[in-house]
Amino acid sequence: AGLLEKLFAELDRQLDAAGLILRQGSMLDATVIATGAARPHFAEKGHEQAAASDPDAAFTRRQGKSGSAYGYKAHVGVDEGSGLIWRVVTTPANINDTVVADDLISGDERAVMADSAYHTHARQRALKARGIKCRLMRRPNKHQPDLAPRLKLFNRLIARRRAAVETTFATLKRRMALGTIRYRGLAKARAQVLLNVIAFNMKRWA
């Protein structure tokens, strides 16, 4: 692990020793952070992609918005109750949320909450096997195109509990200067995200 990873882990240890990490549950979510690098463009003939000024950044669709975003994605596990970020992973923006979900789970929390993008039957079984309550929102599928009323209610209840993560992202972007990735490359993007998360946790601890 690099220096910043060690610093984050040490801060996490001190927060835990101070009794500030409650372990009631982990709230998982991700946010796209645009890069300040110029977007690559496509040539008119042959649709060949021009060289990107940041080869590690990637495109992704904006949820609930038109168009696309170009940059990185910060995936976090937030301790319910304290609001402290105790797990963080940074990836290119096109990495699906569920890919890194298991890295955001501590293993000793009472429950794991997230939207339906994180739900898989395998993850549900794995959480149950570890004695962790699965509070992952459900989504319709080909076998069940319309969710049962109890699952719709379940989703609404989980959505209310995990709404605090949106406040976390708003604080990181608006108050902690994480609205844009200012450096080129995944390693430096990870460093910027980690620095902001460390500052966020220290501010909550103060």
Describe each PLM feature range:
Residues 187-189, 196-206:
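Charge-patterned, long linear interaction tracts outside catalytic cores
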Residues 48, 110-111, 116-187, 191:
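Helix-centered, glycine/charged polyanion-binding patches within enzymatic domains
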Residues 1-133, 139, 195-200:
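Polybasic low-complexity intrinsically disordered regions
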